[in-house]
């Protein structure tokens, strides 16, 4: 118990039935908490007469969170905070475990992007072994990671964000889901399902199962690719490419109707960070860290991911379990940077595959500088899907891809190792220290969502300032706040190293801290 006494509100049975009936019809599923005063009906939510109204949660993202909006005397938003309220702390679970268990254990952090944790963890273990994995194992790991990017991006765009883009930000909340998309544009919904299935089936063929595979191990992978599995995957490539290309056409033709959102959805100068190849090309597996600023000017290049603590700082705010990561040379307030699809396309010179490079050239024409609006994360995801499919096809046709030598066996030869890779949501770091017996004595994870945390907070503030007027939360305002968070595709289980579905609470606070309006959804 927290020791804080919850106020008791007495409502008549008719009032309760009336409120529940209205909001179940509106599709706002969950419970409501009323406190501090009587309750009356609002237009699309429950409004407290003097202080409180509650929505719970932000929908169509992963994890549990809360948003607080602070109002000045004129009723205008002057500050906003995105709180992550779930906690588990996977690093502490690791202590005392053999380092060889880390990849399979770390994959359990997340059910959406387990492969990213598997790869980053295995790379950290490779550093502990001080081995260079066999070339075929390197290529197979790359295919594995690319397949996960496809399935995760498909989930984010088609299942979670396409209702906003296809149906509009002010659509009936009861229809703002994949079923509403299926009703209005059946082909789009089917394409999203097919792309995710495509990625998941590759993961299953390589790793043995779709969720939490343990195929990537210290020193390489556990089993080689068979000719039958290679051929089966290659047969699915043409359809996947066709879906990716027509999805890009659909998105480019649709986002013209979202000029206001493009202008206000996280559209501000920040740094951008990502891993690139030695030639500056896009990569998800291995390379050096690069930073560019909002003008597209190179800020730092050829940074070794193993030295991340030299250029990245982390800070914990009292209002969130999610760490905020910043670029150390510029400090906490000025070192805001973004990672993920938008950042990767801003820092890369090229994708390195024909179709994706053509789309990247068009994408870069959206602004003369770096592309700043976080609304364009959606566009960037589709370009990356196209790149991943093209790159997998190339790797699967490599003459060495069926080689049987896929693992280097060694004992620990170092007491510290760092592994880094590009997860769907951005750069991921795993850092382990072991004792002489090979047991983990310390672990640190730097997650993409944490690296986007400062930018997400600024984005919520920008959207709220643009759309929140007065002391009531409307559906359109709420959905736009949710939508800008969905653009970043945060994985809150990863960021707090916890498991759970997305729940959200939004509060409007007066200058004296009183809750004016609150919405809670589960």
Segments (PLM) and residue ranges:
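Aromatic-rich beta-strand edge motifs centered on tyrosine
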Residues: 433-434
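Intrinsic disorder/low-complexity segments enriched in polar/small residues
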Residues: 6-7, 18-19, 42-45
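Extreme N-terminal basic, low-complexity initiation segments
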Residues: 1-12
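Active-site bordering "gate/hinge" segments
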Residues: 41-427, 447-522
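N-terminal basic, low-structured, amphipathic or hydrophobic segments
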Residues: 10, 15, 19-22, 27, ...
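Active-site catalytic microenvironments in core metabolic enzymes, especially phosphate/sugar-handling
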Residues: 438
């Amino acid at each position: 118990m927290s020791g804080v006494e919850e106020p008791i509100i007495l409502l008549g049975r008719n009032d309760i039935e009336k409120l529940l009936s209205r909001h179940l019809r509106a599709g706002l599923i969950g419970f409501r908490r009323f406190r501090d005063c009587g309750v009356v009906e609002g237009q699309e939510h429950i409004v407290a007469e003097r202080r409180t109204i509650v929505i719970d949660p932000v929908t169509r993202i992963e994890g549990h969170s809360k948003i607080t909006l602070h109002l000045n005397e004129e009723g205008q938003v002057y500050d906003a905070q995105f709180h992550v309220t779930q906690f588990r702390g996977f690093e502490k679970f690791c202590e005392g475990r053999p380092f060889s268990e880390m990849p399979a254990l770390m994959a359990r952090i997340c059910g959406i992007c387990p492969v990213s944790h598997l790869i980053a963890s295995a790379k950290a273990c490779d550093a502990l072994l001080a081995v260079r994995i066999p070339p075929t194992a390197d290529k197979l790991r790359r295919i594995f990671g690319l397949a996960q990017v496809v399935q995760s991006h498909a989930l984010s765009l088609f299942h979670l964000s396409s209702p906003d883009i296809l149906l509009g930000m002010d659509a009936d909340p009861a229809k703002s889901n994949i079923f509403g998309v299926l009703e209005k544009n059946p082909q789009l919904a089917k394409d999203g399902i097919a792309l995710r299935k495509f990625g998941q089936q590759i993961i299953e063929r390589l790793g043995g199962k779709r969720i939490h595979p343990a195929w990537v191990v210290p020193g390489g992978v556990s089993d080689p690719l068979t000719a039958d599995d290679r051929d089966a995957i290659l047969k699915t490539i043409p359809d996947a490419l066709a879906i990716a290309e027509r999805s890009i056409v659909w998105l480019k033709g649709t986002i013209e109707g979202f000029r206001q959102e493009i202008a206000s959805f996280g559209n501000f100068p920040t740094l951008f960070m990502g891993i690139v190849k030695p030639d500056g090309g896009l990569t998800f597996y291995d390379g050096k860290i690069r930073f560019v600023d909002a003008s597209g000017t190179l800020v730092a290049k050829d940074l070794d991911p193993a030295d991340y603590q030299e250029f990245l700082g982390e800070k914990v705010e009292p209002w969130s379990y999610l760490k905020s990561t910043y670029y150390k040379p510029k400090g906490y307030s000025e070192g805001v940077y973004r990672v993920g699809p938008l950042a990767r396309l801003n820092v890369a010179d090229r994708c390195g595959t024909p179709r994706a490079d053509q789309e990247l050239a068009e994408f870069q024409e959206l602004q003369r500088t770096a592309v700043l609006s976080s609304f364009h994360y959606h566009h960037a995801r589709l370009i990356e899907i196209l790149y991943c499919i093209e790159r997998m096809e190339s790797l699967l046709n490599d003459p060495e891809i069926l080689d049987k030598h896929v693992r280097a066996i060694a004992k620990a030869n170092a007491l510290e190792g760092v592994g880094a890779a590009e997860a769907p949501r951005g750069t991921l770091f795993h850092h382990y220290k072991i004792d002489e017996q090979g047991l983990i004595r310390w672990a640190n994870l730097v997650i993409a969502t944490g690296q986007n945390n400062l930018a997400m907070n600024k984005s919520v503030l920008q959207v709220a300032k643009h759309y929140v007027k007065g002391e009531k939360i409307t559906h359109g305002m709420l959905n736009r706040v949710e939508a800008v968070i969905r653009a970043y595709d945060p994985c809150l289980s990863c960021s707090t190293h916890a498991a759970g579905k997305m729940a959200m609470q939004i509060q409007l606070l007066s200058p004296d801290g009183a809750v004016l309006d609150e919405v809670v959804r589960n």
